[in-house]
Amino acid sequence: MAANGSNVVSRGAVRFTEEQEALVLKSWAIMKNDSAHIGHRFFLKIFEVAPSARQLFSFLRNSDVPLEKNPKLKIHAMAVFVMTCEAAAQLRKTGRVTVRDTTIKRLGSTHFKNGVSDAHFEVAKFALLETIKEAVPASMWSPAMKGAWGEAYDHLVAAIKQGMKPAAA
């Protein structure tokens, strides 16, 4: 890990092929300008698949604001979606998940405190892949693109889980 708290997270080099990188970069280029809307759709899909996941978010627990209109959810969703996509886009070039050390530790700690489990990460992965599939042109989506985004997501989750360990919290 970098002593200056910058961009190093995962231990050891990540294997992410040129083809995977190209698929992620091509699709992210299409989604980037609409990341606020797409990120919000990503979270709405999470709550559609797992309504109880709302309880994991302090700003949603006692809120009467519909998810579609909740400004805090919109801000959070965009930040998470952009971070996920940017980390995926950098994976091959850097050989690791590139999210600030302090951010990944905070994410790990927050996810640990809120009781996020492997099942929650799987729901989020499903929702992410479905959201990306809906956001890119149908002719672009392929099993290879799904695999590239899935692998990138898995690397990000592995980095977050490192921060979820009690010793790291």
Swiss-Prot record:
<feature type="binding site">
    <location>
        <position position="110"/>
    </location>
    <ligand>
        <name>heme b</name>
    </ligand>
</feature>
<dbReference type="GO" id="GO:0005634">
    <property type="term" value="C:nucleus"/>
</dbReference>
<dbReference type="GO" id="GO:0009414">
    <property type="term" value="P:response to water deprivation"/>
</dbReference>
<dbReference type="GO" id="GO:0016491">
    <property type="term" value="F:oxidoreductase activity"/>
</dbReference>
<keyword id="KW-0479">Metal-binding</keyword>
<protein>
    <recommendedName>
        <fullName>Anaerobic nitrite reductase NSHB3</fullName>
        <ecNumber>1.7.2.-</ecNumber>
    </recommendedName>
</protein>
<keyword id="KW-0560">Oxidoreductase</keyword>
<keyword id="KW-0561">Oxygen transport</keyword>
<feature type="short sequence motif" description="Homodimerization">
    <location>
        <begin position="48"/>
        <end position="52"/>
    </location>
</feature>
<dbReference type="GO" id="GO:0005737">
    <property type="term" value="C:cytoplasm"/>
</dbReference>
<keyword id="KW-0349">Heme</keyword>
<keyword id="KW-0539">Nucleus</keyword>
<comment type="similarity">
    <text>Belongs to the plant globin family.</text>
</comment>
<dbReference type="GO" id="GO:0009737">
    <property type="term" value="P:response to abscisic acid"/>
</dbReference>
<dbReference type="GO" id="GO:0019825">
    <property type="term" value="F:oxygen binding"/>
</dbReference>
<dbReference type="InterPro" id="IPR001032">
    <property type="entry name" value="Leghaemoglobin-like"/>
</dbReference>
<dbReference type="InterPro" id="IPR009050">
    <property type="entry name" value="Globin-like_sf"/>
</dbReference>
<dbReference type="InterPro" id="IPR012292">
    <property type="entry name" value="Globin/Proto"/>
</dbReference>
<dbReference type="GO" id="GO:0009409">
    <property type="term" value="P:response to cold"/>
</dbReference>
<feature type="binding site">
    <location>
        <position position="72"/>
    </location>
    <ligand>
        <name>heme b</name>
    </ligand>
</feature>
<dbReference type="GO" id="GO:1902074">
    <property type="term" value="P:response to salt"/>
</dbReference>
<feature type="binding site" description="distal binding residue">
    <location>
        <position position="76"/>
    </location>
    <ligand>
        <name>heme b</name>
    </ligand>
</feature>
<feature type="binding site" description="proximal binding residue">
    <location>
        <position position="111"/>
    </location>
    <ligand>
        <name>heme b</name>
    </ligand>
</feature>
<keyword id="KW-0963">Cytoplasm</keyword>
<dbReference type="GO" id="GO:0005344">
    <property type="term" value="F:oxygen carrier activity"/>
</dbReference>
<feature type="binding site">
    <location>
        <position position="106"/>
    </location>
    <ligand>
        <name>heme b</name>
    </ligand>
</feature>
<dbReference type="GO" id="GO:0046872">
    <property type="term" value="F:metal ion binding"/>
</dbReference>
<dbReference type="InterPro" id="IPR019824">
    <property type="entry name" value="Leghaemoglobin_Fe_BS"/>
</dbReference>
<feature type="short sequence motif" description="Homodimerization">
    <location>
        <begin position="118"/>
        <end position="130"/>
    </location>
</feature>
<feature type="site" description="Homodimerization">
    <location>
        <position position="146"/>
    </location>
</feature>
<dbReference type="Pfam" id="PF00042">
    <property type="entry name" value="Globin"/>
</dbReference>
<comment type="subunit">
    <text>Homodimer.</text>
</comment>
<keyword id="KW-0408">Iron</keyword>
<dbReference type="InterPro" id="IPR000971">
    <property type="entry name" value="Globin"/>
</dbReference>
<feature type="domain" description="Globin">
    <location>
        <begin position="15"/>
        <end position="165"/>
    </location>
</feature>
<keyword id="KW-0813">Transport</keyword>
<dbReference type="GO" id="GO:0020037">
    <property type="term" value="F:heme binding"/>
</dbReference>
<comment type="function">
    <text>Phytoglobin that reduces nitrite to nitric oxide under anoxic conditions (e.g. during flooding or in waterlogged soil). May not function as an oxygen storage or transport protein. Has an unusually high affinity for O(2) through an hexacoordinate heme iron because of a very low dissociation constant.</text>
</comment>
<dbReference type="GO" id="GO:0072732">
    <property type="term" value="P:cellular response to calcium ion starvation"/>
</dbReference>
<feature type="binding site">
    <location>
        <position position="58"/>
    </location>
    <ligand>
        <name>heme b</name>
    </ligand>
</feature>
